[in-house]
Amino acid sequence: MRLLIIADEDPRTRDHVMKVFGDKDYQIVAPDSVDLVLKDVLRKEAPVVLLGNVFDNMPAGDLIPILKKCNKNLTIILVSNEESLPLLRKLRREGIFYHALKPAREEDRDELLQAVRCAFANITGLSGPVGAAAKGHS
């Protein structure tokens, strides 16, 4: 089972994303505070985080560098309808793996699923269990 953190302040988006991944061989963790996300990231238990624009009153642009300092191998997928190119460029420099739109339509859900599959494939090198590969990146 692949562990996936959903860190989004909007409960509707969080619930919707949980439904998208709930039956797809993923163990979903949806903490309600930054400190709980940091705890999981520091323990290197979850190799992929789906991060909204704002989480626990903290903008993604402030949170991403902290998450990457806690675990440089963490894969962050920004799930946002943000359209500001300068901001998206900044977040890419900070280390996001991918920017996906909030899954409002079927195409958005498919895109998000594909981005997460790709993230886990990169972590595992297309072979072996995710947990072992993630622990090997410590």
What kind of region is each of these model predictions?
Residues 30-48, 52-55:
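Acidic, metal-coordinating helix/loop segments flanking the phosphotransfer/catalytic sites
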Residues 10-29:
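Two-component/phosphorelay signaling modules centered on CheY-like receiver
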Residues 47-70, 82-84:
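Conserved phosphotransfer microenvironments
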Residues 108-111, 120-138:
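CheY-like receiver
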Residues 49, 76, 99-100:
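Two-component signal transduction core modules
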